[in-house]
């Protein structure tokens, strides 16, 4: 999947499918990009077991650390989010075009408001990709134009290619 064309991706499905979909995207990007090319952040709910499982996978990779290596961009509650947001915002606003950011918003309540809106808006030279989740497609904000639908009765990937929506039926195991 090309995140340059599909930089706002919503993963829709039941908890098991959300877990698998998020980790699939995460590992694909980790294996294809060095930490110098792509950094990652994750905002999750530490009270939800599957999201803690995602956290335990993410915490080991160097892509999660700030450029200085002092901050791990993982937040499972409001206090942790408040601690990492200044460093993350600073790195996002730096004009280092060679570094992209992939942000997993498993719990968008941790960064509501202006920061969330700025993350969800796409820019021309967008180096910020966002992955969000929802149990149902209607629950996704409109900014998530591309969707990975992972439900019992409907399994498809909806992507945009040059402003044209392409729907690809897929079989998730």
What is the meaning of each model-derived region?
Residues 1-173:
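Accessory regions of macromolecular translocation/handling assemblies
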């Amino acid at each position: 999947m090309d995140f340059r064309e599909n930089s706002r991706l919503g993963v829709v499905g039941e908890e098991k499918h959300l877990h698998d979909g998020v980790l699939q995207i995460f590992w694909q990007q980790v294996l294809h990009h060095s930490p110098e090319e792509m950094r990652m952040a994750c905002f999750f709910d530490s009270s939800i077991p599957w999201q803690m499982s995602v956290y335990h996978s993410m915490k080991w990779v160097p892509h999660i650390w700030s450029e200085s290596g002092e901050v791990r961009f993982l937040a499972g509650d409001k206090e942790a989010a408040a601690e990492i947001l200044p460093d993350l915002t600073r790195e996002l606003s730096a004009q280092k075009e060679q570094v992209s950011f992939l942000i997993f918003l498993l719990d968008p309540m941790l960064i509501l408001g202006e920061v969330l809106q700025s993350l969800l808006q796409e820019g021309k030279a967008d180096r910020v990709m966002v992955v969000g989740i929802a149990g149902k497609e209607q629950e996704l904000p409109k900014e998530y134009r591309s969707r990975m639908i992972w439900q019992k009765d409907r399994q498809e990937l909806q992507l945009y290619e040059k402003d044209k929506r392409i729907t690809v039926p897929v079989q998730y195991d």
